[in-house]
Amino acid sequence: MDYPDVVKRKVKIIKSKTLLSDFIDPSCLGSDDSIESADYKLFIADVRDLPHVTEKLALVEKQRPTLILTECLLIYMKATDSEFILNGFASLFPSVSFLNYEMIRPDDKFG
């Protein structure tokens, strides 16, 4: 999930690269602003809006092992918002892994 312009750009890239699109059922590639297949979800949402996110993930099999991948997300939020997001996903999925990438270095203003 991401902001509208980012999701639309990602959908366009996925559709244009067979290396990526071959992993997704073609019937799930009709929209320009989301991809929602059995194994992959990409949609517009504010990650802090947990009720909306929960609604978008309603059909996901919660018992399956789940990977949540984020990039440059938590560093820009208040610690309480980050904690809320992590706890929210942990409560939705009993078997969840969270992979987070932040562009920081030990000697920068974020480190």
Task: Describe every region a protein language model picked out.
Residues 1-111:
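Alpha-helical subdomain
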